[in-house]
A protein has these predicted regions:
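N-terminal lobe/hinge region of extracytoplasmic solute-binding protein
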Residues: 2-63, 179-183
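Short, well-ordered beta-strand segments
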Residues: 1-4, 372-374
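Extracytoplasmic/periplasmic ligand-capture domains
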Residues: 58, 67-107, 113-120, 174-180, ...
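Charged, glycine/proline-rich intrinsically disordered loops and linkers
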Residues: 57, 62-64, 152-172
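Surface-exposed binding/hinge segments that line
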Residues: 108-164, 307
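Active-site-proximal polar cores
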Residues: 493
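Short, solvent-exposed loop/turn elements at domain surfaces
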Residues: 7-15, 36-38, 43-46, 61, ...
Length: 531
């Protein structure tokens, strides 16, 4: 039996999900299956599919108008957990559900670009696309291209009766709770909301019967409780429960033979600038890239990394992860901002800033260089990171002040309009597209919270989404990174480690090496006990 130490709401999300149930959440790799899956290096292989579409073949056609058609062939004799056949019609039905606006997935990738999904026969799935989409051959392998099937034999009538009403189809249907039926390596036996999920191995799993017979997922909302359970041997696997310093403590308490810590250096950190002129502080950080570059040179990222990551993070000058294919090219072409107070001084002076006799900087408008730096409440590490950066900038003569933002009591609008600099998870270059700027029109949703806009980056991001040639994808990644590192909508800090812990005699969990590695439990069917 495996017992997971996970946040309290995980158990509820595992089955109820955020909009369409387990299909779009972390447990997809435990309770459901997809067309394709990625390994720890981001390499894609068939899952429910017997084969994946190949570019420039009959299975992946690109038409002159930019639309596409992909064809997946399913493995024969697939079944759901209840023994009923899983066919291409289940994907057709899933698409009909996901594109219903009330369910909240109709504008998400890849659903937003699917114009039709058809099943010429029980094993063939033909998808028409409104535009090019690079991941059209690997649906289900990543969170950004999820398209899991739904059991038509269980849900079609309920979906029809609901008339497309999410209020009727989702919370009122037992399928989304204790009645969940999927096609993943484990099938649901019992569900105690917010407390636990019990599951057993699925004999007919597409990749072979799991080697461990039973899995128990426990809800935990306290890190100390989770650590005690792991040390005592009551829990055998903890997914992303611990911060770096807590991982060190757990490693020490375990001793040399007590358990295994997987340090996954994929969590990225940034300092993002506010670009809305009426909210920028000071204004010059929104209007002059030289000022932003000066701040970047004034920050000692290595010192912040060393203090926060407990020695298990990863530094990179370009923001590109060293395990990405385009890393060597990015290292050659993308701007770097090493800690260099002299260069920071030069850039500030070029931008019209003046340093007073007291060592403090004044803006070109002869106002004090007051700079609020925000962090999210609830994390000691984020607070520690913030304190380090604030102290560094103060020593350089900037009137930096620590500010805390509480996501529980504040709105998306308030977060989007924060002045100064906001610490957070680093955005990939394509996520600075102007369509991701939070506005009143989109209810203040979107990851480009600082409101950065660059037409050339938008153009490259649009091309990136539609690129299918591997060489073109590499080139676009580097070109987007070059713009972001030059114009500097954010300061990339470092990669910190997510901590995954498991018992010493549990074999099979693997570190993810790139962002495109899929879920941490993607290979749970291969895990086994070493007696």
């Amino acid at each position: 039996m495996i017992e997971n130490a996970l946040p309290t709401d995980f158990a509820a999300k595992a089955l109820a999900g955020s909009s369409t149930g387990v299909a779009f959440n972390v447990p997809a790799t435990i309770f459901n299956a997809t067309l394709a899956m990625n390994d720890e290096r981001g390499r894609t292989s068939p899952f429910l599919a017997e084969s994946l579409p190949r570019f420039d073949t009959d299975s992946w056609k690109v038409f002159p108008d930019g639309t596409m058609e992909t064809t997946y062939r399913l493995k024969p004799n697939l079944t759901w957990h209840d023994g009923q056949p899983l066919t291409a019609e289940d994907f057709v039905f899933a698409w009909q559900v996901y594109r219903t606006p009330e369910y909240g997935q109709d504008r998400s990738r890849p659903i937003v670009w699917m114009t039709s999904v058809q099943a010429p026969d029980s094993l063939s799935l033909v998808i028409r696309w409104s535009q090019r989409f690079a991941d059209a051959d690997k649906l289900g392998s990543l969170s950004g291209n999820m398209f899991p099937p739904l059991p038509r034999h269980l849900l079609a009538q309920a979906h029809s009766d609901s008339g497309g009403s999410g209020e009727q189809f989702l919370p009122n249907n037992p399928f989304w709770n204790a009645g969940y039926v999927g096609a993943g390596p484990y099938k649901l036996d019992s569900y105690n909301p917010g407390v636990s999920i019990e599951a057993s191995a699925f004999d007919a799993f597409a990749l072979g019967r799991p080697r461990i017979d039973r899995v128990s997922i426990r809800g935990v909302n306290d890190v100390n409780t989770a650590m005690v359970r792991m040390v005592a041997g009551d829990s055998h696997y903890a997914a992303d429960m611990f911060r770096g310093d807590e991982g060190v403590v757990l490693e020490q308490q375990w001793g040399p033979n007590g358990g295994v810590i997987l340090w996954e250096a994929l969590g990225s950190r940034e300092l993002a600038f506010q670009f809305r002129p009426e909210h920028a502080q000071p204004l010059e950080l929104a209007t002059d890239a030289r000022a932003r570059r000066a701040v970047a040179h004034a920050v000692d990222r290595q010192a912040a990394h060393d203090a926060v990551t407990a020695g298990h993070g990863l530094m990179t000058e370009t923001g590109t992860h060293p395990n990405e294919d385009w890393y060597p090219l990015a290292e050659r072409e993308v701007a770097k901002y090493p800690h260099d107070p002299r260069r920071a001084t030069q850039l500030f002076e070029e931008a019209g800033f003046v340093r007073g006799s007291d060592g403090r900087w004044m803006t070109p408008r002869a106002t004090s260089f007051d700079l609020p730096i925000w962090y999210t409440a609830g994390s000691i590490l984020f607070q520690q990171e913030n304190a380090i950066v604030v102290d560094q900038l103060k020593q350089f003569g900037i009137a930096a002040t620590p500010q805390v933002f509480n996501t529980q009591t504040s709105s998306n609008m308030e977060r989007a309009l924060l002045p100064g600099i906001i610490g957070g998870s680093a955005s990939r270059p394509e996520n600075f597209h102007s369509t991701f700027i939070p506005r009143a029109e989109n209810r203040w949703t979107g990851g480009n919270r600082g409101g950065y806009a660059n037409p050339e980056l938008d153009r490259l991001s649009d091309a990136f989404v539609m690129a299918v040639d591997p060489a073109e994808i590499v080139r676009l990644n580097v070109d987007m990174a070059s713009i972001v590192r030059s114009d500097l909508p954010h300061i990339f800090l470092y990669y910190h480690s997510r901590v995954y812990a498991h018992a010493a005699n549990l074999k099979g969990p693997k570190n993810r090496l790139v962002q495109a590695s899929g879920n941490a439990t993607r290979n749970i069917h291969e895990w086994y006990w070493d007696s």
